[in-house]
Amino acid sequence: MGIIKPFRIKSFKHKNPSIEFKDVSIAFGNRPVLDKVNFKINQKTIHGLLGPNGAGKSTMYHLITGLLEPKHGKILIDNEDVTKLPVYLRTRKYGISFVPQYGGTFSDLTLIDNLKAISEIVVKNKDLRLERINYLISKLELENIKNIKAKNLSGGERKKLTIALS
C-alpha cells in the first residue's frame, strides 16, 4: 500500500481551520467529563491529545466533530460558533471528520454502498463523487472487496473503510 495523497472537496473554504473551546462543559449523567475547558488550536499546527482512560479525549473529538453537544460553552471553528451545526455541515464546510476506533460503517451495506451513502451527503456533484470513490478504492486497495458487506470484512478491511468514510 502506498501513501495516499490528501485531497479536499472543492467546496471547502477553510483549508486549515482553527479550533477553539470556550468554557466547554459536558457531563454524562451526574458525572462531569469536561468542566469549563478552554483552548485554541491554531491553523497549520499539529497537536496530540493525551490522558488516562476516562479523561475526556474521545469526548473532545466527538464535540469537535458534532457527534456530541456541550452542556455549556461554545466550540468555534475559524471563529464561527459551530456548537449547533450538524455533523454533515461541519464535514462539508470545514473537512472535519472522525475515524472511530470501533464501528463507523453501515454493517449491512457493501463497502462501495457505504462510500456512496456518505459521499452523497458530502459531495453534491455526482461525477466528482464517483471519481473520489474510485480514487479511494484504488489507493486503499479495496477493489477486490468492494461488493462485500461491511459486517463480513476483516478488522483491517473495516478500518480501511472507516478511513475512506472519514
State the predicted function of each range.
Residues 81-97, 102, 126-130, 147:
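ABC ATPase NBD coupling module
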